[in-house]
């Protein structure tokens, strides 16, 4: 999606249209009230009105993105990994909930799961199925117009089912309004089959590009890219590779020269994005993550960790020696040696930001350090010595005037497709092809890291892991990657994250390696699959809870 006022207006009108046309009883997924009314005749006799109805599905891109609330109640799932630390220890807010889940994962249950997508997901699927059924019954449009409407709707149905599948594996499948109160889950294979079918249909119908008035819509490239992503999760390696190949064959997208440009709206590698306006829709990402000094008593809810910083290679592709900073020293950390993606992702002590030099130190004026648990809430302060830079809007300088954020959310971009194909080729035994795609990402003109060569087996997998961690940092992938690789229970148990406590010292600064958790983190193997919500179990006699959650 690219900027377009027509689409923006359409989305907002569509939210009212949905209430009028399709959401009678929207709190009850099994509501089967007939909708053969005047509203159906109005919708399906006017393509503009039907399109507004369809536009109500586009905000799902926002809901499940890093600026939305449907993944983890507005938290970044990176807070469940070694790469990000939330600053509060009080459950019930964005910062504290994440810490609660990594320290006491037993908190997750069928009656309380902040990562749950079941109820909201099925509500959205019902809306899509109702749209499709209503279209088939009442549409007066041409076959081509109907096909384009159906392709977009089925794209979003696959998109929502993917959110369920990556949490639960096999789920209850509904493709029409023939709803059953008691229905069992389908298998994981059947669930992935439906997702693939919807996306392949979308790819077969959607245009490579829309006209200017519709340029924000999902395209053939978005359908192929989403298919590549979902088939990677399904471990259908050939299907993932083939879908990725189809994206490249379109010859529409190219990597941006500069890494930081890949997150701006309308850039050359953006395949699917969602745009915002001050007047709405908008988001609050800056309010949550800007550094101390940007706004009063807010921001800095979560920050990159020392573990993440040390994951970055040097500009010449080598591992940087951080041993001097695993104690106390007044020597400046080697930030200037790190590859370009570091400075585009992390606001470090000494970085330039909005005309200021960051001072992420105790008592700092632009950026300020606080010990974890020294206060209930960070209020803009960092507990790691770092702040997030990626996604923040450097032009947003006065929060007293504009309190909301409008930077674009890029859901799918070409670098991810390179890395999907790299992993698929690795799984298929094509090590050389996998390395070519990893190197394509590493060697974009503005970065130009040395090419990797001669890697195979586990060494190649480590390189792919490294690139996904760095290239896709804070884009919502790492936690889910570690789950699908079944590595979370091995690497995310009995560990703590760290930071650098920076203190003014004799006209300079002292850097002290500190424990930012003060207790071990845990990952329970049973959380590889999330529990079915209690309400579903209570109202559906055909479904059983997973053995791990009984």
Regions found by a protein language model. Give the residues of each.
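Conserved, well-structured interaction surfaces
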Residues: 46-55, 59-65, 90-168, 182-190, ...
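Long, intrinsically disordered, low-complexity segments
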Residues: 121-124, 194, 260-320, 326, ...
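An aromatic- and glycine-enriched ligand-binding surface/loop that stacks and positions planar moieties
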Residues: 27-94, 200-201, 217-371, 492-495
